[in-house]
Every structure is written in structure tokens, then in C-alpha cells.
């Protein structure tokens, strides 16, 4: 049903051949008039009093009912390659009348999910407060193999002010996570991304327009002094990466290799298909640079001893 909508909108290459030996266009024509489809639609209408076209609505009908698309892809000086948030999962109570989530808050930086959860549960001076911007790094492909950090979003639900806390991370979320949770920040911290230069107490500005599906995450100040986005760009460029960035100690070697190849192939936002030419060029450039420094690898003898 979704593909029928996509075809109508001209968003599919319907001439592509499928596993059936037929084109996608032919398969969709078959499905549209199939007895099974007509039977399901009839069952919904007669027994459930449900309009089949309300189960998977067209974009036009969804807009008529006030529904918006689900995903926003914020960019900014903390996510130059991009990030993603399920904007419809933000509590409507914290949106302004234009449907925009706006927050400028103090950064609370964490390297491991367990440390972030410990701060959420804390009652002491290190606890998470309303308006804080939690920044979790080292959770991308090079850090943990792109782990899912659902435990943080679940823990925030138990805070009376959890909907006033923002989470930014280079890790990922499942579809279950709710709230102002921005993931897949790229480049990830361990790939040199600016998110790895954020410090405790920095001021971060988050804007997510849930209607127009636009957003940004930016460093805009430090030490309680608010500046602007251009200041943030300059500051992030001049700062060194944090010294405590590291991959998880139990990260398997094959995962580290995969993450390295992905980083050389465009990073988190480069897609799931390796750019072999780009990877080979990067490896060759590294080999040449190593040779120029005189760091030749020792020759390997093939003689038996």
C-alpha cells in the first residue's frame, strides 16, 4: 500500500526488475487489483467499520487531518553532516504555538550510557536538571558499533521534568524512544566530529520545527555566556578533541574494522554501501604519507628457519 502511494507521487523507479521476474510497475498493478487486497479492504469496511484508505493514508489526507511527517534531520555546527530526530515523539507540551521545540541549555557530557543513567537517577549535585542538554558521545560505529541507547530515554520518563531534558548523541535510537532525542550525529566524536569537542557547561541551542521538518543543533556559548553560532564554529574548530574519547574496551576487532571502513567511505551519513574507490584512495594516501615519514613496514621474510 505504501508503494502504491509512492508510485502515484513519482518516487519509485517502477521499471526496475524484481525477484518475481517482473518490473516493480507490473507487480504493483497486480497487487492493486488482486483478490487478496480487495478481500482485506472489504473485511475492514464491513466487519471493522474502518475505511481502508485511513489505515495507510495518502499525504494529502494526512495533512487534512493535521498529521505531520515523523522525521526531522537537524544540522548545525555540532552536526555538519546531519542528525535525526523523531520529531512527532516530542511532548507537545514543550512546543511553542508554531510547533517548534526551542531550547538553549547547559551541556552535560557523557562518554558511556551507564554514566548518563547514573546522573539521571542521582539526587546529588551531579543530577540532571530541567533544561539540561545531555550529550552522549562515543556511541557511533567507531565507539560501540552504533549501539541503541534506549535506556537513557526510558530513564528520563521517570523524571517529572524529563520532557524538559534534551539528548544529543552520535549513537542511535529505536522507534520506541520518545522525547527530544537527537541521534546519528555526524561526524561521530571518534571520527573527529565537533560533538567530541563539547565540554560540560557549554551552551547548546536546539531548534526542531515539527511542522516544517527543519532543525539545528549548535554550540552558542560557554561558561554561562551566550554567543552565537559563528562563535561556536570558530570555537569548535580551535578546540582539541577531548582526551577521554575512546571506543568501548569490548568492541570486537571486526566491528572496529567495519567502522573504520565506513568512516573512510563517508561516515555515518554516507550510507550503508561502501564506496570502494574512496576507501582505496584513503588507504593509498595513508600508505604514501607513512612512506614519506620514513615509517616503512619491516619486510617479512618468507624463508624457513
Q: Where are these predicted regions, by residue range?
A:
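Catalytic or ion-coupling anion/metal-binding cores of large enzyme and transporter domains
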Residues: 1-164, 168-305
Amino acid at each position: 500500500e505504501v508503494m502504491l502511494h509512492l508510485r502515484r507521487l513519482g518516487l519509485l523507479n517502477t521499471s526496475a526488475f524484481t525477484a518475481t521476474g517482473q518490473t516493480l510497475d507490473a507487480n504493483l498493478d497486480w497487487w492493486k487489483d488482486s483478490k487478496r487486497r480487495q478481500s482485506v479492504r472489504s473485511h475492514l469496511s464491513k466487519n471493522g467499520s474502518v475505511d481502508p484508505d485511513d489505515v495507510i493514508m495518502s499525504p494529502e489526507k494526512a495533512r487534512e487531518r493535521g498529521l505531520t511527517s515523523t522525521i526531522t534531520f537537524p544540522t548545525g555546527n555540532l552536526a555538519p553532516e546531519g542528525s535525526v530526530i523523531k520529531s512527532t515523539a516530542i511532548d507537545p507540551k514543550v512546543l511553542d504555538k508554531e510547533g517548534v521545540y526551542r531550547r538553549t541549555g547547559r551541556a552535560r557530557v557523557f562518554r558511556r550510557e551507564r554514566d548518563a543513567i547514573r546522573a539521571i537517577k542521582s539526587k546529588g549535585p551531579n543530577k540532571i536538571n530541567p533544561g539540561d542538554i545531555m550529550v552522549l558521545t562515543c556511541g557511533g560505529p567507531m565507539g560501540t558499533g552504533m549501539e541503541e541507547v534506549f535506556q537513557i530515554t526510558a530513564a528520563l520518563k521517570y523524571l517529572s521534568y524529563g520532557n524538559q531534558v534534551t539528548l544529543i548523541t552520535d549513537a542511535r535510537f529505536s522507534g520506541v524512544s520518545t522525547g527530544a532525542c537527537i541521534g546519528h550525529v555526524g561526524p561521530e566524536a571518534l571520527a573527529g566530529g565537533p560533538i567530541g569537542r563539547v565540554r560540560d557547561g557549554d551552551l547548546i541551542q536546539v531548534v526542531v520545527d515539527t511542522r516544517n521538518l527543519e532543525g539545528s543543533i549548535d554550540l552558542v556559548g560557554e561558561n554561562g555566556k551566550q554567543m552565537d553560532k559563528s562563535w561556536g564554529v570558530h570555537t569548535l574548530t580551535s578546540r582539541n578533541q577531548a582526551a577521554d574519547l575512546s571506543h568501548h574496551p569490548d568492541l570486537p576487532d571486526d566491528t572496529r574494522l567495519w567502522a573504520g571502513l565506513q568512516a573512510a567511505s563517508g561516515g555515518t551519513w554516507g550510507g550503508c554501501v561502501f564506496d570502494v574507490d574512496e576507501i582505496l584512495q584513503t588507504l593509498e594516501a595513508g600508505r604514501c604519507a607513512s612512506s614519506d615519514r620514513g615509517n616503512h613496514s619491516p619486510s617479512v621474510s618468507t624463508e624457513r628457519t
